[in-house]
A protein has these predicted regions:
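Short, contiguous, well-structured surface segments enriched in hydrophobic/aromatic residues
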Residues: 1-76, 99, 150-163
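Homeobox/homeodomain signature
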Residues: 41, 88-89
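Polyanionic, low-complexity intrinsically disordered segments
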Residues: 50, 60-87, 94-206
Protein backbone atom coordinates (compact mmCIF):
# COMPACT_ATOMS: atom_id res chain seq x y z
CA UNK A 1 0.00 0.00 0.00
CA UNK A 2 2.92 2.33 0.61
CA UNK A 3 3.90 2.03 -3.07
CA UNK A 4 0.41 3.08 -4.16
CA UNK A 5 0.35 6.04 -1.80
CA UNK A 6 3.77 7.09 -3.09
CA UNK A 7 2.40 7.02 -6.64
CA UNK A 8 -0.45 9.49 -6.13
CA UNK A 9 -0.15 13.26 -5.98
CA UNK A 10 0.73 14.87 -2.63
CA UNK A 11 -2.72 16.45 -2.40
CA UNK A 12 -4.48 13.15 -3.10
CA UNK A 13 -2.34 11.31 -0.57
CA UNK A 14 -2.97 14.00 2.02
CA UNK A 15 -6.72 13.73 1.44
CA UNK A 16 -6.72 9.92 1.71
CA UNK A 17 -4.57 9.84 4.84
CA UNK A 18 -6.34 12.81 6.42
CA UNK A 19 -9.73 11.19 5.98
CA UNK A 20 -8.52 7.91 7.44
CA UNK A 21 -6.81 9.63 10.37
CA UNK A 22 -10.02 11.50 11.20
CA UNK A 23 -12.17 8.38 10.99
CA UNK A 24 -9.71 6.40 13.10
CA UNK A 25 -9.23 9.14 15.69
CA UNK A 26 -11.22 9.89 18.78
CA UNK A 27 -12.86 13.09 17.59
CA UNK A 28 -16.28 13.86 16.15
CA UNK A 29 -15.35 12.28 12.80
CA UNK A 30 -14.65 8.89 14.42
CA UNK A 31 -16.10 6.05 12.34
CA UNK A 32 -18.15 3.78 14.61
CA UNK A 33 -18.05 0.94 12.08
CA UNK A 34 -14.41 0.86 11.01
CA UNK A 35 -12.63 3.46 13.13
CA UNK A 36 -11.00 0.91 15.44
CA UNK A 37 -9.77 -1.09 12.44
CA UNK A 38 -8.27 2.05 10.91
CA UNK A 39 -6.60 3.01 14.20
CA UNK A 40 -5.14 -0.47 14.66
CA UNK A 41 -3.42 -0.49 11.26
CA UNK A 42 -2.78 3.25 10.91
CA UNK A 43 0.01 3.88 8.41
CA UNK A 44 0.63 0.18 7.79
CA UNK A 45 -2.55 -1.03 6.14
CA UNK A 46 -2.66 -4.54 4.67
CA UNK A 47 -4.47 -4.38 1.35
CA UNK A 48 -7.55 -6.14 2.72
CA UNK A 49 -7.91 -3.48 5.41
CA UNK A 50 -7.23 -0.64 2.97
CA UNK A 51 -9.93 -1.90 0.60
CA UNK A 52 -12.34 -2.23 3.51
CA UNK A 53 -11.96 1.32 4.78
CA UNK A 54 -11.25 3.62 1.82
CA UNK A 55 -13.79 5.40 -0.34
CA UNK A 56 -14.97 3.67 -3.48
CA UNK A 57 -13.14 6.17 -5.67
CA UNK A 58 -9.84 5.28 -4.00
CA UNK A 59 -10.52 1.59 -4.61
CA UNK A 60 -11.08 2.32 -8.31
CA UNK A 61 -7.84 4.29 -8.49
CA UNK A 62 -5.94 1.51 -6.71
CA UNK A 63 -7.30 -0.90 -9.32
CA UNK A 64 -5.84 1.38 -12.01
CA UNK A 65 -2.48 1.47 -10.25
CA UNK A 66 -2.30 -2.32 -9.91
CA UNK A 67 -3.22 -2.84 -13.57
CA UNK A 68 -0.30 -0.64 -14.60
CA UNK A 69 2.18 -2.01 -12.11
CA UNK A 70 1.69 -5.61 -13.19
CA UNK A 71 0.73 -4.97 -16.80
CA UNK A 72 -2.66 -6.59 -16.36
CA UNK A 73 -4.83 -5.73 -19.34
CA UNK A 74 -7.82 -7.40 -17.72
CA UNK A 75 -7.53 -5.23 -14.62
CA UNK A 76 -7.12 -2.16 -16.81
CA UNK A 77 -10.37 -2.93 -18.62
CA UNK A 78 -12.08 -3.65 -15.29
CA UNK A 79 -10.88 -0.27 -14.06
CA UNK A 80 -12.81 1.43 -16.86
CA UNK A 81 -15.91 -0.56 -15.87
CA UNK A 82 -15.50 0.46 -12.23
CA UNK A 83 -15.05 4.10 -13.28
CA UNK A 84 -18.54 3.96 -14.81
CA UNK A 85 -19.88 2.37 -11.64
CA UNK A 86 -18.35 5.21 -9.64
CA UNK A 87 -20.00 7.80 -11.89
CA UNK A 88 -23.43 6.19 -11.48
CA UNK A 89 -22.90 5.89 -7.73
CA UNK A 90 -22.07 9.60 -7.53
CA UNK A 91 -25.14 10.49 -9.60
CA UNK A 92 -27.37 8.48 -7.28
CA UNK A 93 -25.75 10.04 -4.21
CA UNK A 94 -26.75 13.46 -5.58
CA UNK A 95 -30.32 12.30 -6.26
CA UNK A 96 -29.96 12.65 -10.02
CA UNK A 97 -33.01 11.40 -11.91
CA UNK A 98 -31.40 8.78 -14.14
CA UNK A 99 -34.49 8.38 -16.32
CA UNK A 100 -33.95 11.90 -17.63
CA UNK A 101 -30.98 10.44 -19.48
CA UNK A 102 -33.12 7.86 -21.31
CA UNK A 103 -33.36 9.80 -24.57
CA UNK A 104 -31.57 9.60 -27.89
CA UNK A 105 -30.37 13.19 -27.44
CA UNK A 106 -28.91 12.65 -23.95
CA UNK A 107 -25.21 12.60 -23.19
CA UNK A 108 -23.15 9.90 -24.87
CA UNK A 109 -20.95 7.54 -22.92
CA UNK A 110 -17.91 8.94 -24.72
CA UNK A 111 -16.20 5.55 -24.86
CA UNK A 112 -16.74 2.12 -26.31
CA UNK A 113 -18.44 -0.49 -24.18
CA UNK A 114 -16.02 -2.70 -22.25
CA UNK A 115 -15.12 -5.88 -24.07
CA UNK A 116 -16.06 -7.80 -20.92
CA UNK A 117 -19.56 -6.35 -20.99
CA UNK A 118 -19.91 -6.88 -24.74
CA UNK A 119 -18.81 -10.51 -24.50
CA UNK A 120 -21.08 -11.22 -21.55
CA UNK A 121 -24.10 -9.70 -23.29
CA UNK A 122 -23.43 -11.72 -26.45
CA UNK A 123 -23.07 -14.91 -24.42
CA UNK A 124 -26.51 -14.27 -22.96
CA UNK A 125 -28.18 -13.70 -26.32
CA UNK A 126 -27.97 -9.90 -26.57
CA UNK A 127 -25.98 -9.76 -29.77
CA UNK A 128 -24.12 -6.81 -31.26
CA UNK A 129 -26.93 -5.13 -33.16
CA UNK A 130 -27.57 -1.54 -34.12
CA UNK A 131 -30.10 -1.31 -31.30
CA UNK A 132 -27.63 -2.59 -28.70
CA UNK A 133 -24.94 -0.18 -29.86
CA UNK A 134 -27.38 2.71 -29.71
CA UNK A 135 -28.50 1.87 -26.19
CA UNK A 136 -25.00 1.35 -24.81
CA UNK A 137 -23.92 4.62 -26.41
CA UNK A 138 -26.22 6.36 -23.94
CA UNK A 139 -24.28 7.51 -20.86
CA UNK A 140 -26.75 6.38 -18.20
CA UNK A 141 -27.46 3.03 -19.84
CA UNK A 142 -23.71 2.38 -20.17
CA UNK A 143 -23.26 3.17 -16.47
CA UNK A 144 -26.15 0.89 -15.49
CA UNK A 145 -24.66 -1.87 -17.66
CA UNK A 146 -21.30 -1.47 -15.93
CA UNK A 147 -22.93 -1.61 -12.50
CA UNK A 148 -25.06 -4.69 -13.17
CA UNK A 149 -22.11 -6.46 -14.78
CA UNK A 150 -19.92 -5.60 -11.78
CA UNK A 151 -22.41 -6.99 -9.28
CA UNK A 152 -22.49 -10.22 -11.27
CA UNK A 153 -18.73 -10.36 -11.77
CA UNK A 154 -17.32 -9.09 -8.48
CA UNK A 155 -19.92 -10.12 -5.89
CA UNK A 156 -19.18 -13.81 -5.46
CA UNK A 157 -21.50 -14.52 -2.52
CA UNK A 158 -24.76 -16.06 -3.72
CA UNK A 159 -26.64 -14.38 -0.89
CA UNK A 160 -25.35 -10.96 -1.99
CA UNK A 161 -26.43 -11.50 -5.58
CA UNK A 162 -29.80 -12.85 -4.44
CA UNK A 163 -30.37 -9.81 -2.24
CA UNK A 164 -29.55 -7.38 -5.04
CA UNK A 165 -31.60 -9.38 -7.55
CA UNK A 166 -34.60 -9.28 -5.22
CA UNK A 167 -34.28 -5.53 -4.74
CA UNK A 168 -33.95 -4.86 -8.46
CA UNK A 169 -36.88 -7.18 -9.10
CA UNK A 170 -38.95 -5.01 -6.76
CA UNK A 171 -37.87 -1.88 -8.65
CA UNK A 172 -38.87 -3.50 -11.92
CA UNK A 173 -42.24 -4.63 -10.56
CA UNK A 174 -42.93 -1.13 -9.27
CA UNK A 175 -41.98 0.50 -12.58
CA UNK A 176 -44.11 -1.91 -14.57
CA UNK A 177 -47.02 -1.88 -12.14
CA UNK A 178 -47.49 1.82 -11.42
CA UNK A 179 -48.58 2.63 -14.97
CA UNK A 180 -45.85 5.15 -15.70
CA UNK A 181 -44.31 3.10 -18.49
CA UNK A 182 -47.67 2.57 -20.17
CA UNK A 183 -47.97 6.35 -20.47
CA UNK A 184 -44.38 6.89 -21.58
CA UNK A 185 -43.33 7.34 -25.18
CA UNK A 186 -41.89 4.44 -27.14
CA UNK A 187 -38.33 5.75 -26.78
CA UNK A 188 -38.47 5.68 -22.99
CA UNK A 189 -40.07 2.24 -23.01
CA UNK A 190 -37.34 0.85 -25.28
CA UNK A 191 -34.64 2.08 -22.89
CA UNK A 192 -36.37 0.38 -19.97
CA UNK A 193 -36.80 -2.81 -21.99
CA UNK A 194 -33.06 -2.88 -22.59
CA UNK A 195 -32.33 -2.30 -18.91
CA UNK A 196 -34.67 -5.19 -18.02
CA UNK A 197 -32.81 -7.43 -20.47
CA UNK A 198 -29.53 -6.56 -18.76
CA UNK A 199 -31.16 -7.23 -15.41
CA UNK A 200 -32.26 -10.67 -16.61
CA UNK A 201 -28.71 -11.27 -17.81
CA UNK A 202 -26.74 -10.31 -14.71
CA UNK A 203 -29.19 -10.22 -11.80
CA UNK A 204 -32.03 -12.59 -12.64
CA UNK A 205 -34.71 -13.13 -10.05
CA UNK A 206 -34.89 -16.86 -9.37
Amino acid sequence: MSDYLESVSPSQRSRIEGTLDARGGGGRAHDECSGDLIAHYAGQYPIWVFLEVVEFGVLVDLWRYCSGRWGERGMRDEHYVLTSVKALRNACAHNSLLVNGFTSTAANAGHQVSRFIAISLAEHGISKTKSRRAKLKNLRVAQIAATLYSVNNFCELDTTQERHAKRMGEVRSYAEGCGVLSRANDGIVSFFDFVWKMLDTWLPVE
